[in-house]
């Protein structure tokens, strides 16, 4: 059974991926502070940082 904490963490990680891929540095910072995992990977094996870098949002890599 999946716990509510696991579901919440997964939602945070999904939001982090979207924020990183679109260059929303403020959202990335807030999500990391709330517990999003910068090392999590999406279904293609990409991390939030690799999505940010691949989209040209290199300032996110400094977080």
From Swiss-Prot:
ANK repeats sit at 11-43, 44-63
Q: Name one Pfam family in it.
A: Ank_4
SUPFAM superfamilies in the cross-refs: Ankyrin repeat (SSF48403)
PROSITE patterns recorded: ANK_REP_REGION
Q: What is this protein called?
A: Putative ankyrin repeat protein RF_p14
Q: Does the keyword Transcription apply?
A: no
Among InterPro entries, the record links this protein to: Ankyrin_rpt, Ankyrin_rpt-contain_sf
Question: Which keywords are on file for this protein?
Answer: ANK repeat, Plasmid, Repeat
- Please indicate which superkingdom the organism of origin belongs to: Bacteria
The answer to whether keyword Transcription regulation applies is no
């Amino acid at each position: 059974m999946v716990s509510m904490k696991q579901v919440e963490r997964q939602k945070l990680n999904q939001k982090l991926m979207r924020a990183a891929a679109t260059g929303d540095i403020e959202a990335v910072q807030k999500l990391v502070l709330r517990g999003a995992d910068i090392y999590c990977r999406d279904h293609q094996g990409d991390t939030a940082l690799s999505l940010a870098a691949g989209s040209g949002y290199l300032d996110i890599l400094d977080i």
